[in-house]
Amino acid sequence: LIAERPGRIRLFREGRLSTYAELPVYHRGESGLLGLALHPRFPEAPYVYAYRTVAEGGLRNQVVRLRHLGERGVLDRVVLDGIPARPHGLHSGGRIAFGPDGMLYVTTGEVYERELAQDLASLGGKILRLTPEGEPAPGNPFLGRRGARPEVYSLGHRNPQGLAWHPKTGELFSSEHGPSGEQG
């Protein structure tokens, strides 16, 4: 599967490229369709997860789930909503991946509002950790903390764009990008 930022998901199979799904997105700057992940038990659990920016009902980022139906995907439900987005479309984060623990990890940017990255009541500037159903994952560090979003796994991020796990230790690595030197 290939994600295209304007909202199209393409299926490349046996040398052929076809449209798998088309999702409505707000596509400006770095926003749009930004990440895809297969359920860790795919195809037994026939779900594809996507991170997108939407404008309908208020501008925001969200994680949605599609049901895999052979050659196409059909929007099944919203897994997580209310991730900050701004009209400029910058610093939306948007990488999603299932970790070795079977949980869904979601990167979110601080949308050029640096204070969001340290605000535990905001989903912006974080790495989130969810169950495949979209609930806060057991063992998240801020579960039960008053005023904190229980989905938060890591905070203080500018615009994380990559996720990977060490193959032996399972340690999570996240990559971010930006200009060199002092960020002041």
Model-derived regions, located:
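Acidic, Gly/Ser/Thr-rich repeat motifs that build Ca2+-stabilized beta-propeller blades
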Residues: 1-115, 162-184
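Beta-propeller blade signature
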Residues: 61-72, 119-133
